[in-house]
Amino acid sequence: MARECLSKGFDLIDWYELDPEVVKDCQKHLPKICGEVKANNNVKTYWGDAFESIKKVKDSKYDKIFVDLNDDQFCIDLAAKNMKSLKRILKPGGVITAQVGCLSKKPKQIKNWMELLESNFGNVELTEAFIPSFDCRWNFGSSSHK
């Protein structure tokens, strides 16, 4: 995710990551993909539970928030429980985007994500992209904070 943000010209990225081992393995086995992120001083990594970490973040700090949880119901419930904190740190006019899974494989989960975003922000848009490593079209739900 950080690599894609850098490729789109983001000036500063705060990356909240639970598992340092996953990142180390990605850097080791996928150096072409991860090398740019590792070498970039515009990416600040916060280790640990993201939802705990954002409790300390000042209000309206972020223009964009990307939520990259698994697409199972537990993670949707976890996001729902923490949506107030996510809204608090998103600037007015900012956009929150969540990877919501594959519509053809898990339509109920996508519906639940979309309802969660709609109920909290009053708007939601579903987009998709082909992810080669997932071998399917992957969906993303986005809402703007008005």
Where do the protein language model's features map onto the residues?
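Core SAM-dependent methyltransferase catalytic element
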Residues: 120-122, 132-146
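Acidic carboxylate-rich catalytic motifs and surrounding loops in phosphoryl-/glycosyl-chemistry enzymes
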Residues: 101-102, 128-132
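Glycine-rich, charged/polar anion/phosphate-binding loops
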Residues: 51, 125-129
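The AdoMet/dcAdoMet-binding core of the Class I SAM-like
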Residues: 1-114, 118-120, 136
